[in-house]
């Protein structure tokens, strides 16, 4: 019974990520939709790639959440927005222990921007699908407390 429940929970998580990435395409400006809409199936299927890596790659887990309550109270003015500054203030081990999703989103966005500059379309698609996953994770209340 526990295995069945586990499978249902995992499947719902995968399904939610796929729906979010799929629907996100329709909120894009027309100039971006021209590229993304023909590739909507790729973005949908690969929305779950980060979760597939989560228990295989040690560094992956902390990219999916952040224990915000560890950093004071809203609006978290003392929390550094820059990764290097955050590492100086809290140490990398502590940051990884409590999750790095906002900083990882920034890193992924920089990689995606670089892929656009290089016109590396396969990389653009992969990074877009994964960035959608991390942004969605950042908005899950249980991933942010």
Describe the residue ranges of each PLM region:
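Bacterial N-terminal signal peptides
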Residues: 1-8
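N-terminal, motif-rich segments that launch catalysis or mediate targeting to/interaction with membranes
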Residues: 8-130, 141-145
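Functional cores that coordinate and move charged inorganic groups
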Residues: 132-135
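Active-site microenvironments of hydrolase-like enzyme catalytic domains
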Residues: 138
């Amino acid at each position: 019974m526990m295995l069945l429940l586990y499978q249902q929970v995992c499947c719902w998580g995968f399904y939610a990520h796929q729906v979010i990435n799929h629907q996100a395409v329709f909120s894009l400006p027309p100039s971006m939709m021209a590229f993304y809409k023909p590739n909507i199936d790729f973005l949908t299927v690969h929305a779950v790639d980060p979760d597939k890596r989560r228990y295989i790659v040690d560094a992956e887990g902390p990219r999916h959440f952040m224990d915000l309550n560890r950093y004071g109270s809203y609006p978290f003015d003392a929390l550094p927005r820059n990764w290097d500054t955050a590492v100086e203030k809290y140490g990398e081990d502590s940051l990884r222990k409590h999750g790095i999703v906002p900083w990882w989103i920034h890193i992924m966005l920089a990689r995606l921007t670089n892929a656009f500059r290089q016109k590396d379309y396969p990389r653009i698609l992969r990074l877009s699908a994964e960035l959608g996953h991390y942004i969605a994770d950042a908005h899950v209340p249980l991933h942010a407390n």
